[in-house]
Amino acid sequence: KPVEPVG
């Protein structure tokens, strides 16, 4: 599954 960018 794609990883969501964390800011």
Swiss-Prot record:
GO CC aspect terms: extracellular region
Statement: the UniProt record of this protein carries the keyword Kinase: no
Keywords linked to the UniProt accession: Cytolysis, Secreted
Tissue-specificity statement: Expressed by the venom gland.
Localization terms from the record: Secreted
GO biological process: killing of cells of another organism
Function, as annotated: Presents moderate hemolytic activity at physiological concentrations (micromolar range), and weak lactate dehydrogenase (LDH) release from mast cells. Does not induce mast cell degranulation, and antimicrobial effects. In vivo, injection into mice causes moderate edema formation, but induces very weak or no change in nociceptive sensibility. It also causes an alteration in rearing (standing on hind limbs), but does not impact locomotion.
Name used for this protein in its record: Cryptide Pep-9
Organism of provenance: Tityus obscurus (Amazonian scorpion)
